[in-house]
Structure formats: C-alpha cells, structure tokens
Amino acid sequence: MSEQERVQECLRKEIRSLLISTKDGLTPQQLEKEYLLMVGNHLPLRILGYRSTMELVLDMPDVVTVSPCGDGTIILRAIPDESTKGIANLVAKQRSSHKVRNSMQKGRPSVCSGSSSRRRVPYRGRVPPILPAVVKSELKDLLALSPVLLSDFEKAFARRFGRSFQYVQYGFLSMFEVLNAASDVISVEQTRAGSLLMLKRSISEEKQRGWPAVTKGGKMFTQPFRMKQQGSYSTGSPVAKACFSQPTSNMEPPKQILNAEKTFKSNVVETSRLNHTEKLNQLENTFKSVISQIGPGGTINPELKHKLRFVVSKFPEGLLISKLLREFEIMFKEQLSPKQLGFLNVTELVGALSDILRVEFREGEQDLLVFDANMKPLASVQSDKKIDVKACVSSPPRNSLSTAAVKETAWDCLPKNHREPEQKICKKPNLVVKPLQLQVGVNKSELNLAMANHDIPPDAVRDKKLCRLPPLDTSTLVGVFVEYIISPSQFYIRIYSRDSSELLEDMMIEMRRCYSNQLVSDRYAMPEYFIQPGHLCCVRISEDKWWYRVIIHRVLGKQEVEVFYPDFGNIGTVQKSSLRFLKWCYTKLPAQAIPCSLAWVRPVEEHWTSRAIIQFQKLCGLKPLVGVVDEYVDGILNIFLCDTSSNEDVYFHHVLRTEGHAIVCRENVPSKGFRELNPLALYTKSSAGPEDVVLTELGCPSQQHYFNEDREISPQSKENELPTLDEIPIGMPCLESVTIGDDVWDENWLPLQAKMGKGGDAPSHLFTSSRGGKKPYLSCKEMPQKDWCFSAPKDMWDDSWQPSSLVNGMKVEVQKQEELSAQEKNIGTTRSQKQPNLESSSDSPTLPKLEEFYISLVESQQSAEGSQFEPSSIQTQVKQMQLSTAALSTTPAAVDSPEKHSGSVESSPESLKNDFSSSHAITVFKDKSHGAMDQLSLILSPEHQISQKLYIPRSTATAALGAAARLATSRRLLHWYPSVKRMEA
C-alpha cells in the first residue's frame, strides 16, 4: 500500500468517527474545525489532490452522505459500516442538544431545526458572491480558444494571463463556487480525463422551443433562442432578435409581446386547458423576450454610454474604432477597459451599443468607423465612399431594444422597397444593403417574403466566386500534395508552401472556431431558396469535425446536395441542413486545388486501366511530393511528379512506363476527363492579378505571367528577336542544388555550360530591374568589341547524351589557330549584321524576347590575336582563382564543330582574369511576356554578400533528385535557372 493510499484510508476512518459522534451532522466548515481539534492538523487535501473539503467528501460516497438543509446549508452525515453500526444506533437514541457546538457565535441556531422554546430566524447560510465582469471576461477569453480540463485550469490561466487565478480574493471558497457563479457562460462536462470546462452552448430544451413564425404557406417553424443573461455571452455569439416574426412588416414587435402577455393573463379559460409544462414554457418565452431586448448593452452604465456618445459625436466624419479608447481617455482623463465591462475588445463593446452608435466600413479603409446613431451621414462621404456590408463588425451589432419601442434592424429593412435597384441606407445600424441577386426560377415576391422571415447575416457570401491560384512558371519546382485522383491524366494537387497550405490550415482552424459555436452555426444556416448550383458556402464533415469551403454542384433531392471542394478537388454528397453561409472574410484565400495531368504520358490503351490508377494512387500516397511544372494545356497543369522520401528518387512516369501502364511521349495529351467536366474552371474565376495572391514561395520574379501558347508577339518583338539554335527537346531538369557562395561543393565547377549561339549576341552591359518596371538596355554602340554570348545547352531524354562542354577532366575540343581566326571573323560579321536591329530596339522600354538565356561577361581591352587557348593553363588558373572568379572562369565553353555553325571560344587565362576583375556579375535573362525580360544579377565578388538562394542548373538529363529537392517546400531557398521554351512566331 502506498503512502497516499494509507493516508486516505486513515482519513476515511477519522471522518466517519467524527460524523458518527454527531447526531445532527456537521457542515463542511465544522468538519474542518472538528478535525483540527481532534487530530491537530488540517485535512490533508493537497496531499490527496483535492482542492476543497466538498471535493473530498464527494469522493467518499461510502463514508459521507451529503444532504442539503431547508435553510440553504449543506449537512454531512456519516454512513456507518459493520463495525460502527452499534455506535451509530446509540448516538441516534440521544436527546438532541440545542447548544451551539464548538463555541460557535452566540445567537446562531443549531444546524438542524428542532423543538425550541424560542423562535429564531432560520440561518440561510453564506450567499455566494457574484463573479466580477472582468473575471468572467477573462474566463471567456481563456475558454474561447479551446476547452480546458479542471486539473489544468490554473496552468492554462497562468500561461494566458501571467498570473494565478486567486478566486479567494473575489470572495469564493473553492473553484466549485466559481463554476456555479459562472454557470451561465461555462459548462462542465465529465470525461475520462476529468472535468472539462468549456463555453456554454445552447441547451437542448432551448432548441426545442422557439418563436413561432408564419411562412408563406402558413406553416410554423421554430428558431432557437439566442439569449444570454445580462453581462454574460459567448465570444462571437451575437444575441439575435427575440421578437415574434410577422408576415406583415407594419406590425411592431412590442405590440406582439404585449398582446402575448395580455392573452396569457386574460384568457384564463384557454390557459386552464394547457398542462403545467406548457404554462412554464409560455412564461419562460415572455421572460426571454424581455431579457433579449435589453441585450448586453443594457449592462453598461448609462453615464458611460452618454460619455461614449459624446466622444463619438465630436467626429461627424467618423472615428476610427482603434482610436476610440484613446480619445475617451484624452477627453475625460480616465481609462476605459472593455474587459472590466465584460467585453473581449472594443469592437464587441461598440457592437453591443447599437442603440447609440453605428459602425461603417468604407472601401480603402483598414479600420471600422464609429458614428453617432442619431447623426445623419454626410452626403459627400456617401457619394465618394460606399459602405460595404460584408466587412461589418466581426461580432455583428446586438439589438439593444427597450420594452416600450423596438426598432427594426438592417436585416428587417432588407426586403422593404426591394424593387428599387439603388442602394438603400437603413436606420440601424445604417449599413448600405445591396439588393439581392435573384436566383433563376425563383419568384421575386416569394423571395422577398422568405427573406422577411429569415435573418441573412450581412457578411454572408451570396453571389461571389473564388479566385484560382495564378499559373506557375515553366520548370518551377514545388512541393505538392496529391489530394484527389481520378486517373494519371485527371487529378488535383495542393501546393505545400508557407503562402498556400499554411494559410489554408489557418483559415480552417478559424472556421472551426467560428462555426463550432452553436449560435453562429444556427445564424448562418442556409435557407432552401439559396441552395442553388454554383453557390459558395461551407459545410462541416461529421467524421473529422472540420469545416470546408464548398460549391454546390447539383441538387440531388429534398435532403441532399452534391458539392465540390475547391481546396481539395473532390466532389461529395452532404445534407442540405449541414450547409452554412460562408463568411466574406473566408473568400480572400484562392481555391487551393489545381487540376493536373501527369506530363509526357498517355495510357497504353484508349483509357487508363484500373491497375494503372491503383498504381498511381500507391505512388502518390499521403505524403509530400516534388513536382516540376511543364506547361498548361487547356488550363490544365501538366506536371512531373517525383517521390524523394526514399534513398532513390522515383519519377512516376518512369514507374508507369516500367510497369507497362503508360507510354512516355514527348508531348502532353489534353485530358479527356477535364474536358468533359472541370468544376474548378466552372465555378471559380481566374486571379485578377498578382496583387490578389502572390506566390512568393514559388520564386516568381515577374508581376505578370503568360503562357507561351497564349502569347501574342508584337511586330516590334519579332524584329528584335535574335536567332537561336534549333530547338532541342528539353529533358528532365537536374534537381541537385547549387549555391553561389562560399559553400559551393566543388569550387572548380559552375553549373552553367557556355555555348556559343550561331550568330547570336547579347548586350553585355549589366543592369538591374525592379518588380515595378524594367529599364532599357544599352545600344550596341556602347558595347565593347569583344562580348561573348553564352547559352545553356538544352537537355535531352536520351541517357547516352553527354554535354559537349565539359570541365575538370572532361572533353574540350581544341581547334587550330587558323580555324579560330576564321570563325572569329565570321562571328564579327554576324555581329555587325545584327547591330542595326539592336540599335533600333535600344529605345524600347522592354528587352526583346530571347529563346535562351544569356550570360554576358565584360572583357578587357586586350587583343584577341595575342591570346592563346591552352587547356593546361586554364586548369592551373582555375585552381589559383578565388571563389568568385573561379566560378566564372570555370564556366565551360561548349565548342561544337563548324558544321553546326557554332562559334568557338578563344581566350587566355590572363584575359579571363582581367575580364573577371572588371566585372563580377552575371545577368541571367529569362523569357517573359510580350518581349519583357527579367534578369537575375548574381554578385560573385567576395566582398559582396553571399547569396542564400539555391539555383538549380539544367545541365544533365537524368540526374536524380538530391537533398536540395527536399527543400522545395517552405524555405524560399530553391529556385530554377530560367528555362527556355521555343515560341511560335
């Protein structure tokens, strides 16, 4: 037996002996004193893990029985066992003593009532104190994040507010009393882990009772009450209107309440027929109507409300809600704390004072504006800046209605004058309400009547479409999740990055926190007439308790609808009752699903076999993959997928070809499945611009992106177009990372293979470009005579293909001096022929399009005739150079045969060294839209800061994915060297 068990067993015997010796029992306070007098120590509550005496005795049901007394006190009596039954019988036969035990205060009667010669006022016990509003606000703030176990409450409170929860200073003796005092906002549920504290939700009895409302057909429906006691309400759960809905708009709610009370009191004959339960329900409804009319704003001191109104009235053009507390402090020299009033923040405080204040949101403003409710808005302000309903207070204004007069809110004003197309400004809370866009096939009068009987939240999405993600650049390396698979030619991916997947997770967490509140969920319930194909809403999946954005695809029947998940790509069936309006703030994030097809593959037969689909599903699994963007065909992304989780990288198209499920072709076949049905293109719209969502994770340097097949080439760009090599099929890119800096793995190797283009030339003067615009390059007149243009060779799928330009032991073709001189003359002739075009394009704001990227190296003023091409001297020079110059000097020169019309490179180590000393930067040109080009200036000088980005070369055909490919997730350190794709003129 452990020490704790021994102490507990001994304590059980001592408590039983104390209570058996007392005929009338003891209160918990008396038990503590009796135990202290008998044993000499206090009850060992902390040793046994208890917080109060009541918790201790409740854990001993076989020793102590708890019985409440008529005066409000609690009496503890012993339950005798076999050995103490005789003593209990003897004590029960004793005569009751009316003396006060243990020198209690004189004048206090005994615990139990008995025959007494003197009649005394019965003792009602200690009245539990009221929990202060600031404490209740802190408890709501703590439990709004997540429920907390009672055993972890102190740690959670200290972690949240930086101090322990001292309930004694508020007049409470235990947490049991605190929870009883906060029972209107906190509920306790018993779980296996212990007592779980959570924010109180609507009671099931309140769900069953509702205000009767008459629909068009005369049927009755119920709506759950959204009622809270004064000064206590859950976070983000606005108090709804508690008046009877009426078919006619001219009937006022106060008259209905008074009529209901009059009918309840006067019509005695009809009421007598009702049973007892119905009477209580009717009386309870009357009380709730009065309480809900008062609202949370009724708990605020009228003097404070007058001060707030005085402060706001000083700003007729509106006061920013973030400056309200400061202006109040400046004007009245006192601080205003919303938490002391029972509110979480100033927004919730202002929302509760809708009877004296109104809130507006204007386009272009980042904050809410507060106005005096009695002041008319300025006409100039209304004409210039429109108020938008969608960005109302996060906790919409609560109704602060008196019993004498109840004014209609903006929601009630919505159906009135609906025939007018222009916007109408309502009185409370003075929000501009746009007319509802009628659904096809819905009668306008029926819609108006239905809306009169249903509350549509002002920030609910009605006719908005989600935006799609902006297209990705070719050869972009991304981390992806394959979310939904139909076939290798028809599946959906989701990008794994800081700007996409993490934002989606944050939004889903916020949606779960918001819609899990029963009051909010009931308020945003979608009526039947809004359930139409194409409507954007949200739904909760009962299996995982998460809320998802969905788009209604089609209505299956009276109870079910088919919905499309724009963030994951799948289509599912849900109940109509589970659909909810989507809040406007949850539409900012674009749809995350991207329709894709596996690049360069097609099925062996006409359609994909089931074995091929199963094999593709096994390859994808539930793990992040690396994807390489190839191109877009009919708006469908064709992408290469690779699994880098094992030691050997696995390309999916290779596996499907090896297994005999697919044929690898060097073109992308349009997807038949997406051609028949593409819900994402049907229900979403393209991103309006990069200002909506910019995928900085993908390293897109340009502000605009156009596909090659969709691009139109202007005549000017055609004239400026430089001739390039014949198109060679681009192979799979190498995914080994290369760093430009001190941490290069091989200092004698640079991941750029220089190759002389046929007659091609590029500007050698370096320039920088910003995201906002691009500067024109210099004309060829200002260029040195000896500017060499290097182009990267394009990779091939053939594994036997080897680049002709190799370094560090690789093959280098050396030609005779005569051949070099002759080819050099040819290069000069070609350069002089192309010079007029370059001069004509120098005045254009953008560079001409290039089909390959060029590296310009500024050379020194040395003669080419005196230079000698010596491979041995080059190798010696490579070893002696610093990192910056070594990276440039070791750039291999791809020298092809003269039959291929490729120029050769002639230089010496001295000239190379001088060239690199004169310029330490490389400008990488990438083909962009309408002739515009981006450059990437790589500073290679040692005194400059080392680049922290990883640049991926396209040097070999079948290089495996290395460790750098696993960094393609959310580090922003992985970038492609710009790839080039031939465009049709």
UniProtKB/Swiss-Prot annotation:
Origin species: Canis lupus familiaris (Dog)
Biased composition (Low complexity): 107-116
HTH OST-type domain residues: 7-80, 127-202, 300-374
SMART domains: TUDOR
Location of the region described as Disordered in the Swiss-Prot/TrEMBL record: 98-119, 818-846, 889-915
Coiled coil, from the record: none
Biased composition (Polar residues): 823-845, 904-915
Protein name: Tudor domain-containing protein 5
Domain of life according to the entry: Eukaryota
Lineage start: Eukaryota, Metazoa, Chordata, Craniata, Vertebrata
Start and end residues of each Tudor domain: 530-589
Signal sequence, renumbered to the chain: none
